[in-house]
């Protein structure tokens, strides 16, 4: 990806495992001790809502992504979660989520002006991006 937040150990620990307000669940897909992908999620019990905050895997093997999402959905089902939200930018991720039953809910318009047309060409290709709910601070504070 041309646009992705560095998802190394330090960042993931800071973002999810040392969060002062929320407890996150993580599932990792491994093969021979090699990480093939991961998913980060949490539930909001009062709202009976689940959030998939981060998912990353090799897009050449979408079945790993599928497996991770299905495992998270099984967890949510056990917790009687009624709605699951996520935000994705890449078509291959969106395709996997749609196969599982997710659908687009809301679109927003964003207006941007570029001085550098080279940057504009890269910026508007969604395949260049990997953004998820976990990349923002939408959740606020408890």
Predicted regions and their residues:
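Amide-forming acyltransferase catalytic core, primarily the GNAT-like/NAT-type
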Residues: 1-53
């Amino acid at each position: 990806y041309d646009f992705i937040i560095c998802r190394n150990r330090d960042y993931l620990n800071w973002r999810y495992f040392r969060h002062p307000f929320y407890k996150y669940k993580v599932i990792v897909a491994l093969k021979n001790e090699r990480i093939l992908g991961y998913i980060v999620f949490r539930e909001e019990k009062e709202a009976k809502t689940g959030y998939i905050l981060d998912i990353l895997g090799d897009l050449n093997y979408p079945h790993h992504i599928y497996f991770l999402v299905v495992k998270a959905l099984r967890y949510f089902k056990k917790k009687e979660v009624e709605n699951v939200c996520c935000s994705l930018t890449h078509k291959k991720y969106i395709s996997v989520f749609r196969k599982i039953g997710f659908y687009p809910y809301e679109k927003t318009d964003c207006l941007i002006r570029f001085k550098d047309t080279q940057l504009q060409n890269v910026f508007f290709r969604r395949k260049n991006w990997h953004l998820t709910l976990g990349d923002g601070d939408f959740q606020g504070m408890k």
